[in-house]
């Protein structure tokens, strides 16, 4: 057997020399020599029979199986895999290569594969060559025999989930060479090849194979960078953008568990010590994929939903009322708002996913979360009914500021058309106030938190509170316009809903005295903050007058001061623009406030 092993090793060296040939002429000569060899290594036993390829090599493999020669059991499938990889791009080898792949999938050769694939998991040297050979078979000639390979899945897919699970020692070995061949990596490459080249029912079966796909994703964050990138690109190309793959299969592929594993890749670049010469960010790549998956109903995760109307509500019908009953409107037990603590949603997968995202960690996760909210507005109230935020005191820390940015972006989201019910017309009934309020001023923004922000001597936090209150009140103003739209005989219900919404918004807003105090103590030279606070004052008077009129505030002297400053000939254009913005806001306050003393001479 020594001479056989020596001959196989020589063949292996020859194949590798073709791959590494520097001169094209040398490579061409060696390929011609290999082609002549292949022509002598193919034969048919009878008319209509499949060709027999490399009979001596296969006989050696069979002999190794019979005699338990692990050295030959390792080298033969390895050489066959190298051969297929070497000739895969050479058109003149197509016929021989396809014949060889078919021959290897015959019963006698499948028995040899079975020997390798049933070996103890610790014997990677027996299993991995078989996986590499199967990978080359499924990819050869664009998947010419991929379907035949899958039809033998009782052998060719045996224990793949087991091979995808790394040993404990491999998980603990943080110094593991990223380029080293491991059983898991070979199994992953095999799965990727099947996702690429299988089609129809075969691909659907693989995608829906829960144990395999779960094991495939399980330790993704510990996989080498190049493999992770290949996996991300395969998901994009072979799952997301495969229009022939059924939506139901995509839904199973993008299960809660698998999506959670993909989300962990946001932290890959921070934890990985592996060199990144290409400068490709794993976080950016997975972000693109998740943005696509989570915001398009075609990809199996996002489901159509009804925006601000929770699952189970029916805003198109009014219950019949007995003529002797007192009409209490939305205060009737029929309309009890039962969504303060939990909101039923259709998008269960996304509801789970958004809870594991970390908007306090990076801007990419904020972008994904806000994009999900925009695509499925039903999830906003669901998210805030479960998520605890702003547990620490307002401080200009990275986590606090990123959470602030997330809340700001959430409030900035547009009001769903017809409150999300459909694209054609407003429903009869208004949405529950407890759902709407979370889209305007989410519950992490309590009166206590916002008041502390306004009273802090930290400009960035104070300005955040001012800005976020302003956009929230402007959004409330727009919601009221929607509620005042002609709703026919149900207009009284919409008017009542507007009042109920105010009843939930008001307790979350800081008191007027705190806003006035902030405006008065803001330095005159800080024109940016003065303009922002003046705009907030105007919003209080115009949008939440019930809060504004709790305090008397005469802006006469403020107006006089602004006019004087505008008359300064040395005023810069930028400062003039800021003062004009402030003037517009203070004039709105003056036109609304009942505390103005227009005819009193300034002291």
Question: For the regions a protein language model found, what residue spans apply to each?
Answer:
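Amphipathic alpha-helical scaffolding segments
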Residues: 150-157, 205-212, 233-239, 251-257, ...
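HEAT/HEAT-like alpha-solenoid repeats
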Residues: 100, 109, 156-159, 211-213, ...
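Short inter-helical turns and helix N-cap capping residues of alpha-solenoid HEAT/ARM repeat scaffolds
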Residues: 69, 123, 180, 224, ...
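Extended amphipathic alpha-helical scaffold segments
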Residues: 356, 389-393, 406-409, 434-485, ...
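Acidic/polar, low-complexity linker and loop regions
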Residues: 203, 330-348, 352-355, 367-373, ...
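Long amphipathic alpha-helical scaffold regions
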Residues: 10-370
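Flexible helix-coil junctions and inter-repeat linker/turn elements that act as hinges
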Residues: 42-46, 84-93, 136-147, 193-204, ...
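Extended amphipathic secondary-structure runs
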Residues: 450-472, 508-560
